[in-house]
Swiss-Prot record:
Compartment(s) where it occurs, according to its Swiss-Prot or TrEMBL record: Cytoplasm
Protein name stated in the entry: Glutamate--tRNA ligase
Organism, scientific name: Anaeromyxobacter sp. (strain K)
Binding site for Zn(2+): C107, C109, C134, D136
Molecular-function GO term, any one: zinc ion binding
């Protein structure tokens, strides 16, 4: 069996979305497991919507996920170029060959004529199919025309899909579709076939929204006289409402999840499990995925995208990182929020306490910004815990911390425990007013960690402000 040559062929009309990323991942894993080749091709024939910004975003997204390509933009390869707009002569040559052999023909029908036929079909409540008006007309390259592929009148085209099994499409459900526009730009099916032939792709793995294209493409392979590749159509990714995943379900681009503070290994881990499994194992390194992944284990049932489960997976991966690693990862997120964080012991301590609480690096910033910015006092917490009744506790803790030569853990703990014992109350009666004073809210890491992270000067400053508030008339 030949080593697999697979491809990922995105259209640069937007960011790398979740569905596309999973398609790339499945192809990449299959190539890596079998010593094959992963080709990246950019299908940029939609000139109005394709942008260099989108190309860059797709490449950046793949690199961030760790999906390197063996041939394609930036790395070259034996079958250049890797942008469809640079391959127009190739499509023209293949189309003209099909015309010469009677397997395609020039269609001279005007847009107005075709629109009139469509309207008539609508009025008669039937589906419009091109009637083959120009099938037998002589080829006149001097006349404006498109090129149509000649579909056999009878029979059916079948293939054994690696994921979906045997699929058959009757030819009478197909029409003579346009394969080359008048400006020389190929339509999707023809461009993909010519590219896959010339790039020697022998396995086409893609989303199952392309199933309906497959019979048409197989007919084109056969007409051109080339071997038909193996096809694998991966199940759709749906939102919680079982509709196709879209922006209304929340973030759908890889870039968005990177910016929210997801780790690439977590995104890869979650995406691969949307359609593939290996026993009960939930978490996989990329090396493990290369070792275990098999297309025969990809299910045919659509996967439901669950942001909460994805966040859980990310949290598990964050917990595997050391505070030192987390600090380097979290620093750009703190700085992007305008917070004066540094890669220092303070940030490492913040990450150590955040690791068990926050599921994304973005949540590190959201939940613990009070370590780097003035607190935003929760009105309910302020009304309940910064009062004349709690002022003595706040004062006692403030004075005890001021007297400490250093904020060693045991000494800080003793401040809180000692005050609770002196007052004959539970630890919460002491800690909670101080927590509100130092963080602005009623939920935080342990007060010993909070005091140590803030440092003595900032802790005393915030306690002094809390004492001022607690002394105000209610």
């Amino acid at each position: 069996m030949d080593k697999p040559r697979v491809r990922f062929a995105p259209s640069p009309t937007g960011y790398l979305h979740i569905g596309g990323a999973r398609t790339a991942l499945f192809n990449w894993l299959w190539a890596r497991r079998n010593g094959g080749t992963f080709v990246l091709r950019i299908e940029d024939t939609d000139r109005e919507r394709s942008t260099q910004l989108a190309v860059d975003a797709i490449l950046d997204g793949l690199r961030w996920l760790g999906l390197d390509w063996d041939e394609g933009p930036g790395v070259g390869g034996p079958h250049p170029p890797y942008f469809q707009t640079e391959r127009l002569d190739l499509y023209k040559a293949h189309a003209e060959r099909l015309i010469r052999e009677g397997k395609a023909y020039a269609c001279y029908c005007t847009r107005e004529e075709l629109d009139a036929q469509r309207k008539q079909a609508e009025a008669e409540k039937r589906q419009f199919r091109y009637p083959g008006t120009c099938r037998d007309k002589p080829y006149d390259p001097s006349r404006p025309h498109v090129v149509r592929f000649r579909v056999p009148d009878a029979g059916a085209t079948s293939w054994n899909d690696l994921v979906k099994g045997v699929i058959s499409t009757p030819h009478d459900t197909l029409q003579d579709e346009v394969i080359l526009r008048g400006d020389g730009v190929p339509l999707y099916n023809f461009g993909a076939v010519v590219d896959d032939i010339t790039m020697e792709i022998n396995l086409v793995g893609r989303g199952d929204d392309h199933v309906n294209n497959t019979a048409r493409q197989i007919l084109m392979y056969e007409a051109l006289g080339y071997p038909v590749p193996t096809f694998a159509h991966f199940p759709m990714i749906l939102g919680a409402d079982k509709a196709r995943l879209s922006k209304r379900h929340g973030a759908t681009s890889v870039t968005a999840y990177r910016d929210m503070g997801f780790l690439p290994e977590a995104v890869v881990n979650y995406l691969v499990r949307l359609g593939w499994s290996h026993g009960d194992q939930e978490l996989f390194t990329l090396d493990e995925l290369v070792r275990y992944f098999d297309l025969k284990d990809v299910g045919a049932t659509a996967g439901v995208f669950n942001p909460e489960k994805m966040a859980w997976v990310n949290h598990e991966w964050l917990k595997r990182r050391s505070p030192e690693e987390l600090a380097k990862l979290a620093l750009p997120h703190f700085r992007a929020a305008g917070l004066p964080a540094e890669d220092d012991e303070k940030l490492r301590h913040v990450c150590a306490v955040a690791r068990e609480r926050a599921k994304t690096l973005g949540e590190y910033v959201q939940q613990f910004r009070y370590f780097y910015a003035p607190i935003a006092l929760d009105p309910k917490a302020k009304a309940k815990f910064l009062t004349a009744d709690t002022r003595p506790v706040l004062q006692a803790v403030r004075d005890a911390i001021a007297a400490l030569p250093a904020l060693e853990t045991q000494a800080v703990e003793q401040v809180f425990h000692g005050e609770a014992e002196r007052r004959g109350v539970g630890l919460g009666k002491v800690a909670q007013p101080v927590r509100v004073a130092l963080t602005g809210g009623t939920a935080s890491p342990g007060m010993y960690d909070v005091v140590q992270i803030l440092g003595k000067d900032e802790t005393l400053k915030r306690l002094d402000e809390a004492l001022r508030i607690a002394g105000e008339p209610g």
